[in-house]
């Protein structure tokens, strides 16, 4: 009987999630992609006066 209960329970997603229930890995990928796009668009590096990001 116990084995039937264990197999019938819904699976648990063990990945870390952000506040809006979005997986953190996806959140970090989106942030990285956005930063790379902005660096390409501005053609500068963070820490330099020309850069609009940092």
Swiss-Prot record:
- What's a single GO CC term here? extracellular region
Quote the record's domain comment: The cysteine framework is V (CC-CC).
Q: Where in the cell is it found?
A: Secreted
Question: Which InterPro entries does the UniProt entry name for this protein?
Answer: T-conotoxin
Q: 4-hydroxyproline: which positions carry it?
A: 49
Quote additional remarks. Answer: Negative results: does not have the ability to interact with the G-protein coupled somatostatin type 3 receptor (SSTR3).
Q: Which residues carry this modification: Isoleucine amide?
A: 53
What family is reported? Belongs to the conotoxin T superfamily.
Signal peptide position in this chain? 1-14
Query: Is the keyword Oxidoreductase in the record?
Result: no
Q: Out of the domains of life, which is the source? A: Eukaryota
State whether keyword Signal applies.
yes
Keywords attached to this entry: Amidation, Disulfide bond, Hydroxylation, Ion channel impairing toxin, Neurotoxin, Secreted, Signal, Toxin
Q: Which Pfam families match?
A: Chi-conotoxin
Q: Tell me the tissue specificity.
A: Expressed by the venom duct.
The name under which this protein is listed is Conotoxin vc5a
Q: Briefly state the modifications made to the protein after translation.
A: Contains 2 disulfide bonds that can be either 'C1-C3, C2-C4' or 'C1-C4, C2-C3', since these disulfide connectivities have been observed for conotoxins with cysteine framework V (for examples, see AC P0DQQ7 and AC P81755).
Propeptide part(s) removed at maturation, as residue ranges: 15-42
Molecular function GO terms recorded: ion channel regulator activity; toxin activity
